A protein has these predicted regions:
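Residues in flexible loops and secondary-structure boundaries
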Residues: 28, 38, 143-144
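Juxtamembrane helix-loop-helix connectors linking adjacent transmembrane helices
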Residues: 14, 19-25, 37-108
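Short, Lys/Arg-rich, polar N-terminal cytosolic tail immediately upstream
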Residues: 1-14
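Transmembrane helix-loop-helix hairpins at the membrane interface
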Residues: 81, 93-169
Length: 169
């Protein structure tokens, strides 16, 4: 058993959830600081982003289905060992209610997309934002399949934004 799994197993669900939510708050705050330091703050940042609910929902749904299909394919093609993230995902979602899962995923999506797409990609470009996104998921760095998957997903999300179709950050 790895040290990471030992640490994870030693945490209560409450501690784990607090840690996960704090990491998302940290990403949002870093994004806010970067928006003010590198740009003109929230107002100009948000007005520079497109807001097209119809196309965003339609194309976002197609993108999500495609990503789920690729995810299923990855799980069929690669060994369980190459996809083991130390049990974090299973531990995080195992005890959550479906409503809590939806809420948590929305928080993660908002905070991470705010930092990496709305802020970092706007100022530093797609390659840097995508690599930083992949490295933030540091537990995947030693797992080439997972790291590559997250990097490709990040690039795909960045290209999605480049096409100017985004709902919110």
């Amino acid at each position: 058993m790895s040290v990471d799994r030992d640490v994870l197993n030693g945490m209560t669900n409450k501690d784990l959830y607090i840690s996960m939510y704090l990491s998302q708050i940290l990403m949002f705050v870093i994004g806010a600081i970067c928006a003010f330091v590198l740009g003109d703050g929230f107002r100009n940042m948000l007005t520079d982003l497109p807001l097209d609910w119809y196309n965003g929902l339609w194309q976002g749904s197609v993108f999500a289905l495609f990503a789920l299909g690729v995810n299923a394919l990855v799980y069929m093609l690669f060994s369980k060992k190459s996809l083991d993230d130390g049990g974090l995902n299973e531990r995080v979602f195992a005890q959550m209610s479906p409503l809590h899962i939806l809420f948590f995923c929305a928080v993660v999506a908002f905070c991470e997309e705010w930092l990496f797409r709305a802020v970092l990609q706007q100022f530093f470009g797609l390659p840097i934002a995508s690599v930083l996104f992949a490295f933030v998921h540091f537990r995947y760095v030693k797992k080439p399949v997972l790291f590559t998957y997250v990097l490709i997903l990040s690039i795909s999300l960045g290209l999605f934004l480049r096409k100017r179709v985004i709902l919110l950050p």
